[in-house]
Amino acid sequence: MGKKYKNIVLLKGLEVINDYHFRMVKSLLSNDLKLNLKMREEYDKIQIADLMEEKFRGDAGLGKLIKIFEDIPTLEDLAETLKKEKLKVKGPALSRKRKKEVDATSPAPSTSSTVKTEGAEATPGAQKRKKSTKEKAGPKGSKVSEEQTQPPSPAGAGMSTAMGRSPSPKTSLSAPPNSSSTENPKTVAKCQVTPRRNVLQKRPVIVKVLSTTKPFEYETPEMEKKIMFHATVATQTQFFHVKVLNTSLKEKFNGKKIIIISDYLEYDSLLEVNEESTVSEAGPNQTFEVPNKIINRAKETLKIDILHKQASGNIVYGVFMLHKKTVNQKTTIYEIQDDRGKMDVVGTGQCHNIPCEEGDKLQLFCFRLRKKNQMSKLISEMHSFIQIKKKTNPRNNDPKSMKLPQEQRQLPYPSEASTTFPESHLRTPQMPPTTPSSSFFTKKSEDTISKMNDFMRMQILKEGSHFPGPFMTSIGPAESHPHTPQMPPSTPSSSFLTTKSEDTISKMNDFMRMQILKEGSHFPGPFMTSIGPAESHPHTPQMPPSTPSSSFLTTLKPRLKTEPEEVSIEDSAQSDLKEVMVLNATESFVYEPKEQKKMFHATVATENEVFRVKVFNIDLKEKFTPKKIIAIANYVCRNGFLEVYPFTLVADVNADRNMEIPKGLIRSASVTPKINQLCSQTKGSFVNGVFEVHKKNVRGEFTYYEIQDNTGKMEVVVHGRLTTINCEEGDKLKLTCFELAPKSGNTGELRSVIHSHIKVIKTRKNKKDILNPDSSMETSPDFFF
């Protein structure tokens, strides 16, 4: 019988609870099981079940576990399940005997009343009345045993241990909200507005920021629009999900900072930071490192079969693959799946009809698990958020960009490709095998090589490197015998290459490797075009072996000199060289006021395609001059934009390079979409265009512009730095990078995001008005070219 009890404890009790509740159980059982701080941190569910079996000989601690679960509102359903499982083991006869011991006057129970009897054992009526009395009695009546009052809540045990002290028996603790197990969808909606058991935690806690989402807009039950973001923070012993309802704190929750939080709320295993909370950066003597196991635990996503077993009311975070999307009038059903099963995610409000497709990954924040008819669903609530991780770009299926076979994709590391600068001479290029075939280079590779040579010459000469002789890195089709390399003078000065040129050369070498591999050139040995100072005497050409060994071959991966915060792990630099003509560019503007981060927008085009560009390196402003032809490489493709960062290569193309952009393509770049077209577009796309302001309304932190044309009206919602622009009814707004967001009535609205920009085109009578620095005035309708 003891073994059966242990099976219930482990397989149907501990196994199905989440990590936070398991840590809570360990804390509550710490006295009974003699768990020290290290054991509480390191023991897993199996080890705890073993200790419970040893300590509680009769039922392996099942009764104790049921009592704990009953005190946690989100686990009440699970407590009932465990009672029924315990009843099955004990049998009806033993249940009747137990009932007689408790209440000798009670009649023998039937099978159905046996369930209630078992419930009485774990939560007898007298105990319920006593608990109710305690709640009314005040502080004196609220004292209970330490083992029942010390979960490692963010403000209690967990945070205390993180700061080097054990939780006090009298520490005020927080309780998750009283989630009902009722499965009616109306109850789910009601649950969003029902007051939760919020516990104000005044004690300051020190945490490290692990990650944050972008700010997003949500709607309160009072139909008021507000902005928030989610974050994940950690101490040295545990992590916490945080709702940050004060977006002015975004800078604090940034860059792996260590911060101090006080006056926050705690509920649902979450922390809530609002306008009343205090957040400050920790001092230099308050730094600490979060163990990797805590970081990995914070990133962990539960398997779907485990979610199906969890109690209704749990809050869920995680990354799931989208299998199917069904859009209804007010809700969207996202069917997610993994290798263990499937589950529906119901999105409403800001989670309704987000732009995603099958194969994308959905990162869910703060979704509620609900059950109905033994079926589990994840339901979005007021603060829920979905972040899309797009599947592999379809362009990867293009033969031009498909991965090459293993032997074609392997090159030596940079150290073997001669990119070091030990002294002041140029290194003699490494030569290919002596007998390459005449088809060693394809025609496409020859074109690529020609482009690369031109590009490298321009870039290095532009950086100020003065080569005393012919440019030695030109490469081309190899003949049937090795070429004698062109050698520089024997005594160039030690300042032959500047540090800046060294960086340029390193970038160019990396870029050429990526480009030529992408084009399909098959180099049987080390890359021959690496350049750099060598020793004080010429090198004999280094010849690779006829059959290169795998010891010096490795799969080439693009190397980024700097990994900016804006680039997520799902985005990658595009290594292909893109020659474009600049059509227009905005002025530089500050998009992050506190850190004074600047950027500008641009529109560029090839001879058959137009691209919107976000440029985060304002030193490149001169490059993005209208009608100039430039070459761009190592840029990032995201959300329909090309993004240019400090690691991106941008250079002028030869003066004799001509590019004719069709007039129809130029017109398409400057056209403003009609409002009725916007209403039918996919929500989540980004919009540029010029619209007339029909009405302006300022409400709190937001400014609402009603724009109109001859096809309809739409609302533009502006937040943050753009709310102070000088704009009146009748003016025109040139909007850049505004997100098309869903709105009730399925009309949609345009919302400002962090990279949005507004240019005000004033009417003649207001021409002399002073404008906000974030905007500019223009009276000519020909604003694009």
UniProtKB/Swiss-Prot annotation:
Residues 168-185 have a biased composition (Polar residues). A motif (Nuclear localization signal) lies at residues 96-100, 128-131, 134-136, 140-143. The modification N6-acetyllysine is found at residues 45, 99, 128, 214, 444, 451, 561, 598, 614. There is a cross-link at residues 116, 128, 561, 683 (Glycyl lysine isopeptide (Lys-Gly) (interchain with G-Cter in SUMO2)). Changing residue 627 to A: Impairs DNA binding. Induction: Strongly induced by IFNG/IFN-gamma and, to a lesser extent, by alpha interferon. In HL-60 cells, maximum induction by IFNG/IFN-gamma occurs within 12 hours whereas, for IFN-alpha, only 10-fold induction was observed after 36 hours. Induced in vitro by dimethylsulfoxide, retinoic acid and 1,25 dihydroxyvitamin D3. Induced in monocytes by IFN-alpha and viral dsDNA. Induced by glucose restriction. GO terms for biological process: activation of innate immune response; autophagy; cellular response to glucose starvation; cellular response to interferon-beta; cellular response to ionizing radiation; defense response to virus; inflammatory response; innate immune response. Residues 91-191, 390-442 are annotated as: Disordered. One of its GO terms (cellular component) is cytosol. Residues 189-389, 562-761 form the HIN-200 domain. Pfam families: HIN (PF02760), PYRIN (PF02758). GO terms for molecular function: double-stranded DNA binding; identical protein binding; RNA binding; transcription factor binding. It comes from the Eukaryota. SMART domains: PYRIN. It is found in: Nucleus; Cytoplasm. InterPro entries: DAPIN, DEATH-like_dom_sf, HIN-200, HIN200/IF120x, NA-bd_OB-fold. Residues 134-146 have a biased composition (Basic and acidic residues). Expressed in peripheral blood leukocytes, fibroblasts and lymphoid cells. Present in myeloid precursors (CD34+) and throughout monocyte development, but its expression is down-regulated in erythroid and polymorphonuclear precursor cells. Present in prostate, ovary and breast (at protein level). Residues 1-88 form the Pyrin domain. Keywords: Acetylation, Activator, Apoptosis, Autophagy, Cytoplasm, DNA-binding, Immunity, Inflammatory response, Innate immunity, Isopeptide bond, Nucleus, Phosphoprotein, Repeat, Repressor, Transcription, Transcription regulation, Ubl conjugation. The keyword Repeat applies. Binds double-stranded DNA. Binds preferentially to supercoiled DNA and cruciform DNA structures. Seems to be involved in transcriptional regulation. May function as a transcriptional repressor. Could have a role in the regulation of hematopoietic differentiation through activation of unknown target genes. Controls cellular proliferation by modulating the functions of cell cycle regulatory factors including p53/TP53 and the retinoblastoma protein. The HIN-200 domains mediates dsDNA binding via electrostatic interactions. This is Gamma-interferon-inducible protein 16. It comes from Homo sapiens. The gene is IFI16.
